[in-house]
């Protein structure tokens, strides 16, 4: 929306603490406003984080080396905003929405003061108008459409337009760049406004027009432990806390590859640059199993790595969720992966310390919980004006020091999310992938998913709970056996322990390097879980613990082989038939 620019203020630096500057200004300034600081004739982007009388404190998003007293500061009159429109998919941005591939053309390193438009003028889009002259529209109403990959990108009345407007001119169908004016309108006061394919929105304000509805669709991710034991709904929230080396990033990469959603927003917030490079190298060559096209066609990457300024970590998190909310308004299912929210919290702690605020637990700011809650609450499912449903599922990785789940960031996250996938260093060291510990993890969506799947598989919810009980009992018996040995437990307990190990080894674990087992579709999960449930219900009588262990090891080996065979192939049916015959033979001979 094109409007008259607001009056801006100016000021001068009077004090500096790292990337935090104290500025005395003349004019009008508001909290969250974008400012530009002149350092060695380079304008550095900053954000107002505290206003007190005629002084403000601004956090600069880039290196402030060379900043001095008296340096000129200008205020834009705008909040920190995201540029939204066609062309964001397949994009690679930093936390301030600069296109990194464009910056890379100028230099191998990120030069401070460089700002690039997120949506290029060079790309042309086939615009089809939908609204007509004389139509009365409000924010979020459809102006036209352009194709973006396999999606129909809806060009909507900007969400910053809060008044009802009447269209006075509409561009004809054709090929234009994103910044071309495609419609003009007049509001009730007679004020003229023009609309392009691009709109801007403050990243720290929730972006929604429509009605929030309860999440009710299952999100299939191809990991048996998540889909069965710790399910997540589209529009839900979940977290993946774990110590260093437990596999948080690997798990998030799996979700970005195989989750049954339309668009994935990958936010690398403070993680190592090498992990981002891995994504950039792999994703263009990987095929989306749901569409058969490159994964990059549905992916947007925001990479603010640990080597970038601390202040930009916060903006990268909010930028990612704003882009996700924008695509949700088109009736699409979005998955936002934030890796890691702990780095964001550490940035908050650093800024809070420089502001001399009263610290909370472990020196984190007292408002940490409310900030984390506000972030996760931006997820959810909605019904848009045209009746379509969109969803935003948020997954946040948490990196507690030493794997301590009692620290403030993890506890604040657990209070608001719908599912908790706790990663275990012990399971990771034992090469149990994914290293999610089923004994400490939980999902508030378990009963709801059970009710949905009851229509497909009778007794699904009860069977899943029974499997979880086997795991708990098996873990208790295993700990007892470590103390007293196998001779100290009854044969019945030994059988429960071996069944729990079988379930863990053959169902909950998957081979990430196997082209078949790395992704398990839901139909295959149902069939395999039915086989495991049959083993749970079977009664065996063994002469000795060695006989029991030998039988279950053979069974494990055969089921593991089955997991690596193409689903419903001839080899698959033959292998499954061998397992069924072995079960029936053992039950007949020993029962």
UniProtKB/Swiss-Prot annotation:
Gene3D superfamilies assigned: 2.30.30.650, 2.40.50.100, Bovine Mitochondrial F1-atpase, Atp Synthase Beta Chain, Chain D, domain 3, P-loop containing nucleotide triphosphate hydrolases
UniProt name for this protein: V-type ATP synthase alpha chain
Matches recorded under SUPFAM superfamilies: C-terminal domain of alpha and beta subunits of F1 ATP synthase (SSF47917), P-loop containing nucleoside triphosphate hydrolases (SSF52540)
Listed transmembrane segments: none
Enzyme Commission numbers on file: 7.1.2.2
List of residues binding ATP: 242-249
Keywords: ATP synthesis, ATP-binding, Hydrogen ion transport, Ion transport, Nucleotide-binding, Translocase, Transport
Annotated organism of origin: Chlamydia pneumoniae (Chlamydophila pneumoniae)
Gene: atpA
Class of this enzyme: translocase
Coiled-coil features, chain-numbered ranges: none
Catalyzed reactions per annotation: ATP + H2O + 4 H(+)(in) = ADP + phosphate + 5 H(+)(out)
One family name in Pfam for this protein: ATP-synt_ab_N
CDD domains found in the cross-reference section: ATP-synt_F1_V1_A1_AB_FliI_N (cd01426), ATP-synt_V_A-type_alpha_C (cd18111), V_A-ATPase_A (cd01134)
Main function: Produces ATP from ADP in the presence of a proton gradient across the membrane. The V-type alpha chain is a catalytic subunit.
Protein family membership: Belongs to the ATPase alpha/beta chains family.
Tree of life domain: Bacteria
Alphabetical list of PANTHER family matching this protein: H(+)-TRANSPORTING TWO-SECTOR ATPASE (PTHR43607:SF1), V-TYPE PROTON ATPASE CATALYTIC SUBUNIT A (PTHR43607)
Gene Ontology terms, MF aspect: ATP binding; proton-transporting ATP synthase activity, rotational mechanism; proton-transporting ATPase activity, rotational mechanism
Biological processes annotated in GO: proton motive force-driven plasma membrane ATP synthesis
């Amino acid at each position: 929306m094109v409007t008259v620019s607001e009056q801006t203020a100016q000021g001068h630096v009077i004090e500096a603490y790292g990337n935090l500057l104290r500025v005395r200004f003349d004019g009008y300034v508001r909290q969250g406003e974008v400012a530009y600081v002149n350092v060695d004739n380079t304008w550095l982007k900053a954000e107002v984080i505290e206003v007190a009388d005629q002084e403000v404190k601004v956090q600069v998003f880039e290196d402030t080396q060379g900043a001095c007293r008296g340096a000129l500061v200008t205020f834009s009159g705008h909040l920190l905003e995201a540029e939204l429109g066609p062309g964001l998919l397949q994009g690679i941005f930093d936390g301030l929405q600069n296109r990194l591939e464009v910056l890379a053309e100028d230099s191998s390193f990120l030069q401070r003061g460089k700002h690039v438009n997120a949506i290029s003028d060079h790309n042309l889009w086939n615009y089809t108008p939908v609204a007509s002259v004389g139509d009365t529209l409000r924010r979020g109403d459809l102006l036209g459409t352009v194709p973006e990959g396999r999606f129909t990108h809806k060009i909507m009345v900007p969400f910053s337009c809060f008044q009802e407007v009447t269209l006075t001119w509409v561009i004809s169908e054709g090929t234009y760049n994103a910044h071309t004016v495609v419609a003009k309108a007049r509001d009730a006061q007679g004020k003229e406004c023009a609309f392009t394919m691009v709109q801007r929105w403050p990243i720290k304000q929730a972006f929604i027009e429509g009605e929030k509805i309860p999440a009710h669709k299952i999100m299939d991710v191809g990991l048996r432990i998540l889909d069965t034991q710790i399910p997540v709904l589209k529009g839900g929230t979940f977290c993946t806390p774990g110590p260093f080396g437990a596999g948080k990033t690997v798990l998030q990469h799996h979700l970005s590859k195989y989750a049954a959603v339309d668009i994935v927003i990958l936010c690398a917030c403070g993680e190592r640059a090498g992990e981002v490079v891995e994504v950039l190298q792999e994703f263009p060559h990987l095929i989306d199993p749901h569409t058969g096209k490159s994964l990059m066609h549905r992916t947007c990457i925001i990479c603010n790595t640990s080597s970038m300024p601390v202040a930009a970590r916060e903006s990268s998190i909010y930028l990612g969720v704003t882009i996700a909310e924008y695509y949700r308004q088109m009736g699409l299912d979005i998955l936002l992966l934030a890796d890691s929210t702990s780095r964001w919290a550490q940035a908050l702690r650093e800024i809070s310390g420089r502001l001399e605020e009263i610290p909370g637990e472990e020196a984190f700011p007292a408002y940490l919980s409310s900030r984390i809650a506000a972030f996760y609450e931006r997820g959810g499912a909605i019904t848009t004006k045209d009746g379509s449903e969109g969803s935003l599922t948020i997954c946040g990785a948490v990196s507690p020091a030493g794997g301590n789940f009692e620290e403030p960031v993890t506890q604040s996250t657990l209070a608001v999310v719908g599912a908790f996938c706790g990663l275990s260093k012990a399971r990771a060291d034992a090469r149990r992938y994914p290293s999610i510990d089923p004994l400490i993890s939980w999902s508030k969506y378990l009963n709801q998913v059970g009710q949905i799947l009851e229509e497909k598989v009778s007794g699904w919810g009860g069977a899943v709970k029974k499997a979880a009980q086997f795991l708990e009992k098996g873990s208790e018996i295993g700990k007892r056996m470590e103390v007293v040995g196998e001779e100290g437990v009854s044969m019945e307990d030994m059988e429960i322990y071996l069944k729990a190990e079988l379930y863990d080894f053959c169902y909950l674990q998957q081979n990430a390097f196997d082209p078949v087992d790395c992704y398990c579709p839901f139909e295959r999960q149902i069939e395999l879980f039915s086989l495991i449930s049959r083993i749970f219900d079977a009664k065996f009588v063994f002469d000795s613990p060695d006989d029991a262990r030998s039988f279950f090891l053979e069974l494990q080996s055969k089921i593991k082989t089955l997991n690596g065979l193409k689903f419903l192939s001839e080899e698959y049916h033959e292998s499954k038939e061998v397992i069924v015959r072995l079960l029936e033979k053992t039950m007949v001979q020993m029962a």
